[in-house]
């Protein structure tokens, strides 16, 4: 099976993503921040939208659903938590469910913390994960609805994926994430290398996504909250990893 992925900008700093099954011509949008850029990308490629895979209920991830549903009558897949206001949903999914996009298989991983309903979509064959606002390149999402231990557990689920998986996240926050990370992990050679790469990409107005999970494991301080050297930098030697993660997130919130 072969898949093609297209990345483009939506709203102020959201990413839009289309994943296309070459064999069946099925195409899914990962979230739908706004309809316009998604429609343009579909037109540019000559693809028809068959599915929208929603990761969580925030407006900047579902704002385009109604218009796209009206135009294509596509299937809308969303987290099983029905307490969140996501309209036009055809299929509710939970942890370990598998969603078919043509012949492509997306495995659902519940990754709560940013929101309680947040899920990520893992395409194992394509070695790709769409993590939306749980894991960013060199960062992670704010914890709005969950707890720090909950978010840390979600990050561990994503960290457990193989190093050669590609990470596609919800926002272009990498430059600001790098700036913060260097304040708490300044001697990390992998982070320094990523910082140089990000600076070059942004200077050329290119996206910093996708990144490789192996690189994130080495350079993303939020994935290293259980590393004693990170705890030591925060003067938290011996502290629980979730507590270290919480301190990192609090510092990032204030940065």
Swiss-Prot record:
- Per UniProt, the enzyme's principal EC class comes to hydrolase
- EC numbers on record: 3.1.2.6
Q: Which reaction does it catalyse?
A: an S-(2-hydroxyacyl)glutathione + H2O = a 2-hydroxy carboxylate + glutathione + H(+)
> SMART domains, from UniProt?
Lactamase_B (SM00849)
InterPro entries xrefs: Clx_II_MBL, Glyoxalase_II_hydrolase, HAGH_C, Hydroxyacylglutathione_Hdrlase, Metallo-B-lactamas, RibonucZ/Hydroxyglut_hydro
State which pathway it belongs to. Answer: Secondary metabolite metabolism; methylglyoxal degradation; (R)-lactate from methylglyoxal: step 2/2
Q: Which GO terms describe its molecular function?
A: hydroxyacylglutathione hydrolase activity; metal ion binding
Residues where Zn(2+) 1 binds: 56, 58, 114, 133
Q: What does this protein do?
A: Thiolesterase that catalyzes the hydrolysis of S-D-lactoyl-glutathione to form glutathione and D-lactic acid.
The family assignment reads: Belongs to the metallo-beta-lactamase superfamily. Glyoxalase II family.
Q: Which organism is it from?
A: Bradyrhizobium diazoefficiens (strain JCM 10833 / BCRC 13528 / IAM 13628 / NBRC 14792 / USDA 110)
Q: List the disulfide bonds.
A: none
How is its cofactor bound, per UniProt? Binds 2 Zn(2+) ions per subunit.
Q: Which NCBIfam families match?
A: GSH_gloB
Q: Which Gene3D superfamilies would you find in this protein's record?
A: Ribonuclease Z/Hydroxyacylglutathione hydrolase-like
Cofactor(s) essential for the protein:
Zn(2+)
What is the gene name? gloB
Record's signal peptide? none
Which biological process terms from the Gene Ontology are attached to this UniProt entry? methylglyoxal catabolic process to D-lactate via S-lactoyl-glutathione
The UniProt annotation places Zn(2+) 2 binding at 60-61, 133, 171
Sorted alphabetically, the keyword list is: Hydrolase, Metal-binding, Zinc
Q: How does it assemble?
A: Monomer.
Protein known as: Hydroxyacylglutathione hydrolase
């Amino acid at each position: 099976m072969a898949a093609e992925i297209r990345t483009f900008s939506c709203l102020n700093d959201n990413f839009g993503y289309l994943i296309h099954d070459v064999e069946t011509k099925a195409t899914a949008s990962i979230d739908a921040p706004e309809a316009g850029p998604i429609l343009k990308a579909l037109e540019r490629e000559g693809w028809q939208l068959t599915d929208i895979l929603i990761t969580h209920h925030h407006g900047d991830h579902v704002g385009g659903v109604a218009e796209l549903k009206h135009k294509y009558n596509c299937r809308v897949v969303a987290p099983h938590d029905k307490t969140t206001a996501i309209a036009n949903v055809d299929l509710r999914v939970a942890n370990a469910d598998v969603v078919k996009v043509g012949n492509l298989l997306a495995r659902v991983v519940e990754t709560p913390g940013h929101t309680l309903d947040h899920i990520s979509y893992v395409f194992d064959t394509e070695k790709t994960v769409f993590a939306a606002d749980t894991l960013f390149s060199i960062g992670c999402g704010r914890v709005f609805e969950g707890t720090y231990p909950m978010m840390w557990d979600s990050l561990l689920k994503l960290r457990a994926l193989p190093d050669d998986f590609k990470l596609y996240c919800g926002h272009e926050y990498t430059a600001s994430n790098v700036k913060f990370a260097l304040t708490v992990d300044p001697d990390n050679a992998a982070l320094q290398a990523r910082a140089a790469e990000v600076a070059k990409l942004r200077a050329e107005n290119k996206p910093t996504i996708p990144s490789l999970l192996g690189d994130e494991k080495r350079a993303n301080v939020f994935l290293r909250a259980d590393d004693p050297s990170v705890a030591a930098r925060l003067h938290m030697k011996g502290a629980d990893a979730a507590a270290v993660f919480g301190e990192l997130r609090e510092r990032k919130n204030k940065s």
